[in-house]
């Protein structure tokens, strides 16, 4: 377990323990707000915005304050990354694009978003995991921030190589179809995405 990078323990009862060791840096932000506390707080904030996340069961400190452990229930589903690798036809690409759009509409900027962190719970429902690095806006995510955020998961070749079956551009187009703004804004967003994404 590296400092700042959690270790994951999956228990037989399908619950998970996520373990963080405090960074040794004197001025690390984790000293003021430990990652485990951010995880718990973000889970609460995401749930308040009707986003499915794991249910938090417990938060503990071990060895003074140097180690924090969050115990939570595992989401019942499969990551988009695993589905793309094994059953790509099971990925509802249209609903996935709508899901990304809904996060942005709700003012949620999931900085670490990639297809390994998005769980397909059913054909029409998704959930998030590993959301420690999330920023919440009071309104909708601005256009430029949407473009940068949406391009993030498309940088992972292990995912996009599988997504080519359905088409990376198709995923972007499906997202753009949700964007009910002026055509000028739509074109601008598409241009930014094409410059950032490995399409």
What feature does the model see in each segment?
Residues 1-75, 101-106:
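Conserved ATP-binding subdomain of kinase catalytic cores across diverse folds
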Residues 24, 79, 136:
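Conserved protein kinase catalytic core
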Residues 69-73, 125-131:
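A short beta-strand motif that forms the metal-chelation/ATP-contact edge
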Residues 99, 103-127, 158-162, 172-180:
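Charged, low-complexity C-terminal accessory regions
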Residues 127-199:
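C-lobe/activation-segment region of protein kinase-like
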